[in-house]
Amino acid sequence: MIELQNISWQTPEGRKVLKDVSLKLRDKRLIAISGPNGGGKTTLARILMGIEQPSSGKILYNGRDITSLDVTARAALGISFGFQQPVSFKGITVRRILTLAAGHPLSEEKICDLLQKVGLCAKDYLDRDIDSTLSGGESKRIEIATVLARDTSFVVFDEPEAGIDLWSFEKLIDVFENLRSQEERTLVVISHQERILRIADEIIIIGEGQIKDHGPGPEMLSKMLHSDNLVAHRCGRTEVSYE
């Protein structure tokens, strides 16, 4: 479990982005963090990852204070993250990137298993380069496979739907549904997409740098969709609005 205790963060200019945020992110569930743009979601994700350090407050992982630990040190403890925009590596194959992510040799069977978990036909991708010939959806799923290869127990995904088309997004939802039901790990997904919120065990709403609401996924989504100023899908969109 990760526990945030009174976490605040501000820009060098002094603008407060997170204000005294306290949360418990419990094990073995899919937790969606949502809210309006500029509300503090991505900053919170970066603090969880160790990319940013809070201005004040503590972060505990299974009771251990990890506030000052960087990305590498947190990964060694079992915390990893998926990039919002996957990186291309010309000349590096999918097989190689998954082995590098794992940090040790992987059998072909294991690599195929990782690719199948993210909905890719392994034989078509093992020796493909990680470059611009991959679609946005393919790159996103390979990025998720690299996260799984690290075999960590706590994973943060920052807006995994960014930059992909609708068909790829539908496939991505399938991936997260499968991970939620089959994997013994905690998934924290930063998103405002209703389809992702629908499969969450818990939903946390952040706005103006503070926790606005927090509860079981179905209960929270019902509350959001029955509040006139929170329903975006009534206007034909796939994301939930907080205006």
Whereabouts are the PLM-identified features?
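Conserved ABC transporter NBD signature motif
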Residues: 57-64, 110
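Q-loop/switch helix immediately C-terminal to the Walker
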Residues: 85, 91-107
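The feature captures the beta-strand-to-loop junction immediately N-terminal to the Walker
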Residues: 34-36
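Conserved structural motif at the start of ABC-family nucleotide-binding domains
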Residues: 2-4, 17-20
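ABC ATPase NBD coupling module
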Residues: 65-80, 224
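Walker B catalytic motif
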Residues: 159-160
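Helix-to-loop junction immediately C-terminal to a conserved catalytic motif
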Residues: 49
